[in-house]
A protein has these predicted regions:
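Catalytic cores of alpha/beta
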Residues: 98-105, 322-323, 381-399
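Glycine- and acidic-residue-enriched helix-capping/strand-helix junction motifs
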Residues: 5-16
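Flexible glycine/acidic-rich beta-alpha junction loops that bind and position SAM and/or redox cofactors
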Residues: 6-7, 96-100, 232, 282-283, ...
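Short helix-capping segments at alpha-helix termini
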Residues: 26-28, 78-84, 108, 294-304, ...
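Glycine-rich beta-alpha loop elements in corrinoid/cobalamin-binding modules
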Residues: 15, 22, 30-180, 416
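Radical SAM enzyme core and accessory elements
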Residues: 2-5, 49-55, 97, 162-165, ...
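Radical SAM [4Fe-4S] cluster-binding motif and immediate context
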Residues: 168-171, 184-185, 189-371, 376-380, ...
Length: 593
């Protein structure tokens, strides 16, 4: 659906690739990344590497794919107990609601949830391999180490303690992760792209990963982590808490190296920065773009070879006014702006109608395409007569200012945000309407599932009308007429893609809109929570960001082009020569039950 139509199958997600890259740099070379959007028939019970089931099976999932993740866990539990892999879960679902994947409700459970980043996983594996005896199955090692309390000093985990019948008695939370301070120490993303499973309809695995020559054809856009964190504290956003109010960046040298290697080894020319707010700190941003502007790839300037985009806020874009030409010279061609509400009625991040219009004008003058992202909310009408408060009024202004694409989502409760529980207790959250009930995949912002209005169906139709007002045959025709005056021939393409996406969005959401219109609306005041006790370890306090080179006693050796992570425990146990087999399925947008 909009706004992710078609991109969901054309971008291999950065998160699961980062885990795969970390495993490769840690010595686990026999790793496979299975993307659900490419391999919809994949079943863990059918996976084989070198003729046997892997020792370690990991699932990365967003909240909207929670049901699919549970199905994966259940299928993996069908493997014979003697060869059953250790099952780990990660991703946003595991970070904010780990208990839901650990058997708190009686369903088949994962063994442990990783509630942090790559190095939490590597720290866990180092602990397990230090206790491994010979070729002892990794899951048996985990159970033994877990029962003796050996996991309690690894921040960023949640695991279950069970009785003799394997019934969950309590969940143990080892506390917040210790953040990686220097993002240059992250594993190089080039390794993750070399682990992708070939797209197919098979239930099992191919003999080998997707050839390098075919990677860019299936994933033409490469998403890269450039920065983490945002200085704004929006009540509906979980990002500040996850990043522990810190802002972390990669250096321009590291980013240039990643783009160069991905371009040279896989043929990537399109990149998307997985940033929360790329312009968050102007001084750090300038260091990055200054280096990229001086970088050469394949014999020419980077901006002649590479097309990349990222996300930022309107206010921070205005703070970069004098430097936007340099940003463009660094190769930035498009920026997705968190406009939310131009009048700052929903949230005030320093944006205003004049400021937003000026930011769009400055970006266009610099040769950068502005891509607005909006949030619809209860207090915003569809149309207003005397001001710019209405949704269609703002869509009109954004289109007039040069917006090429449009994103309109309804504000929804987000686990991990400050307002999450209050949204439920205040009676805003819908449990169902008519014969339909709210399911996990409806938490993506396309469905109105939280509203104080007696007629929430109006908001559902407002979103569709806003998209129809922006994407339609008339606008396609006008974009073709204005083609010579625009920066890029992106207008007609965006209109055609947008109209196709609108068709899918109508097909997927119209039933819910009609249920809201005709059915009885049911609300809930209880937010999702664990049905079993969660014990927070006193020995796992909130810790500051650290240098992981010190944590691993100097065994992490980051070299800009050949970054490696060496763990003496792995080599001593022979993991380098006979690596533990890993499996990484990824549950991704638009893959719903």
């Amino acid at each position: 659906m909009l706004p992710f139509i078609f991109s969901d199958t054309r971008i291999a997600p950065a998160g699961v690739r980062a885990i795969g890259a970390a495993m490769v740099e840690g010595g686990f070379t026999k790793t496979r990344i299975v993307l659900q959007q490419w391999n919809r028939n994949f079943r863990p019970s059918a996976m084989r590497l070198d003729g046997r089931a892997p020792d370690l099976f990991m699932i990365s999932s967003m909240a909207i794919h929670g049901q699919r993740a549970k199905e994966m866990i259940a299928d993996a539990r069908r493997i014979d107990p003697s060869s059953q892999p250790l099952i780990l879960v990660g991703g946003p679902k595991a970070i904010y609601e780990p208990w839901d994947l650990l058997g708190a409700g009686g369903a088949p459970a994962a063994d442990v949830a990783i509630t942090g980043e790559e190095y939490v996983l590597l720290n866990l594996l180092e602990v397990l391999l230090a206790e491994r005896a010979g070729k002892e199955p990794l899951r048996q090692v985990f159970l033994r180490v877990r029962d003796c309390g050996g996991l309690d000093q690894v921040p960023g985990l949640m695991y279950a303690r069970t009785d003799a019948r394997q019934a969950v008695q309590e969940l143990v939370d080892t506390g917040p992760q210790r953040l990686l301070n220097d993002l240059d120490e992250l594993p190089h993303p080039v390794h993750g792209f070399g682990l992708l499973e070939r797209p197919s309809r098979r239930a099992g695995l191919a003999p080998g990963p997707l050839p390098a020559s075919q990677v860019a054809r299936h994933s033409p856009t490469a998403s890269l982590v450039l920065t983490f964190g945002c200085r704004f504290g929006c009540h509906y956003c979980p990002i500040p808490a996850y990043n522990q109010r810190q802002y972390r960046v990669k250096s321009g040298q590291r980013i240039a190296d990643e783009m160069r290697r991905l371009h040279d080894e896989f043929g990537h020319r399109l990149f998307f920065g997985a940033d929360d707010n790329f312009f968050n700190d102007p001084s750090r941003t300038l260091k990055i773009v200054d280096h990229l502007a001086r970088t050469r790839i394949a014999g020419g300037p980077l901006h002649k070879r590479i097309f990349w985009g990222t996300e930022a806020t309107v206010h921070d874009t205005l703070r970069m006014t004098d430097h936007l030409p340099l940003v463009r010279k660094a190769g930035l061609r498009a920026i997705w702006l968190g406009v939310e509400d131009m009048t700052a009625t929903l949230i005030n991040k320093g944006q205003s109608v004049p400021g937003t219009m000026r930011a769009f004008s400055l970006l266009q003058s610099a040769g950068i395409l502005p891509m607005p992202m909006m949030m619809h909310h209860d207090s915003q009408p569809l149309l207003s007569r005397r001001d710019a408060h209405g949704l269609l009024n703002q869509v009109y202004l954004l289109r007039k200012a040069g917006a090429i694409t449009l994103q309109v989502l309804m504000i929804s409760p987000a686990p991990g945000s400050r307002s999450y529980e209050e949204t439920f207790t205040s009676g805003l959250v819908l449990q169902g309407a008519g014969r339909m009930k709210v399911e996990a995949h409806m938490l993506d912002g396309n469905y109105v599932i939280a509203s104080k209005l007696a007629k929430p169906w109006r908001k559902q139709f407002n979103i569709l009308l806003a998209y129809l007002y922006f994407y339609n045959p008339l606008q396609l025709l006008l974009s073709m007429i204005r083609l010579r005056s625009t920066l890029y021939p992106a207008g007609p393409t965006a209109q055609m893609v947008g109209m196709a996406g609108l068709g899918h969005t109508v097909r997927r959401t119209l039933g819910w809109a009609m249920a809201l219109l005709l059915g009885k609306i049911r609300r809930t005041g209880i937010w999702p929570q664990s049905s079993v006790p969660i014990r927070q370890l006193a020995s796992a306090p909130r810790l500051p960001a650290i240098d992981y080179r010190k944590l691993f006693s100097g065994h992490l050796t980051p070299t800009m082009s050949e970054s490696t992570a060496e763990f003496p425990q792995l080599s001593r146990l022979g993991v380098g020569s006979t690596p533990t087999k890993l499996e990484f399925p990824e549950v991704t947008p638009e893959v719903t039950p």
